Amino acid sequence: MAEEQVNLSAGLAPDCEASATAESTVSLVGTCEAAAKSPEPKDSDSTCVFCRIAGRQDPGTELLHCENEDLICFKDIKPAATHHYLVVPKKHIGNCRTLRKDQVELVENMVTVGKTILERNNFTDFTNVRMGFHMPPFCSISHLHLHVLAPVDQLGFLSKLVYRVNSYWFITADHLIEKLRT
């Protein structure tokens, strides 16, 4: 299938994240590059920690109730904010650079799940929320995942850098959706 793939590197650059165990950080650049070369999503990758979590093969990760059958949500193991959740597709998708125009709805659904999880946890000030993706090669897990962070006004110095809006290494969900649509 020769579907059009959006070039997110124009004007930006590198998605992924440091929210898994040490063994999952082995070959970051190689796995992100491999994912970028293969835009067709696989159902699952046995070497991917997020695929194992989605397949309920990681009993140490508590899945949060998610009303979307194609997505899972769980707390980040290294939270940068009081509320720091990851919304992850069950199907293996490498990162935000591998997304195509026809996958805008997936990203929108990820945002909806993020907002719903925040509301369920009594956080409703959406002006104080940041949702976005790390860009390759600045990712530790080469499986698409949305960071949901709140309250952002309480992020520490390093977290403000790591999750800096529309930087070389982090793109907000809204900006990604806009890029995918153009």
Curated annotation (Swiss-Prot):
The keyword S-adenosyl-L-methionine does not apply. It is found in: Cytoplasm; Nucleus. The keyword Acetylation applies. Its EC number is 3.9.1.-. Belongs to the HINT family. It holds the Pfam family DcpS_C. One of its GO terms (cellular component) is nucleus. The active site is at H145 (tele-amp-histidine intermediate). The modification N-acetylalanine is found at A2. It catalyses: adenosine 5'-phosphoramidate + H2O = AMP + NH4(+). It comes from Pongo abelii. Its main location: cytoplasm. SUPFAM superfamilies: HIT-like. This is Adenosine 5'-monophosphoramidase HINT3. Forms dimers to octamers and even larger oligomer. Interacts with CALM1. AMP binds at D76, I77, H145, L146, H147. GO terms for molecular function: adenosine 5'-monophosphoramidase activity; nucleotide binding. Keywords: Acetylation, Cytoplasm, Hydrolase, Nucleotide-binding, Nucleus. Exhibits adenosine 5'-monophosphoramidase activity, hydrolyzing purine nucleotide phosphoramidates with a single phosphate group such as adenosine 5'monophosphoramidate (AMP-NH2) to yield AMP and NH2. Hydrolyzes lysyl-AMP (AMP-N-epsilon-(N-alpha-acetyl lysine methyl ester)) generated by lysine tRNA ligase. A motif (Histidine triad motif) lies at residues 143-147. It is an enzyme of class 3 (hydrolase). Residues 49-160 form the HIT domain.
